[in-house]
Amino acid sequence: MREAIHLGCEKCTRRNYHTTKNKKTHTEKFSVKKYCKFCREHTLHKEMKL
């Protein structure tokens, strides 16, 4: 079953994006470089709980 997750900026800790992930097949935490409009740059965004 897919579960909703938030992606939070590692620099300012704001939750800018949300997505879903299958926890059975992807057990590790999700992280991706995305644009943070508060920092005004591309930063690493990591999975956070809702």
Curated annotation (Swiss-Prot):
Transmembrane intervals: none
Keyword field contains Ribosomal protein: yes
UniProt-listed GO biological process terms: translation
Keywords: Ribonucleoprotein, Ribosomal protein
Annotated Gene Ontology cellular component terms: cytoplasm; ribonucleoprotein complex; ribosome
Recorded coiled-coil stretches: none
Disulphide linkage map: none
Signal peptide (from-to): none
Origin: domain of life: Bacteria
Name of a matching Pfam family: Ribosomal_L33
GO MF term list: structural constituent of ribosome
Family recorded in the similarity comment: Belongs to the bacterial ribosomal protein bL33 family.
Name under which the protein is recorded: Large ribosomal subunit protein bL33
Protein's gene: rpmG
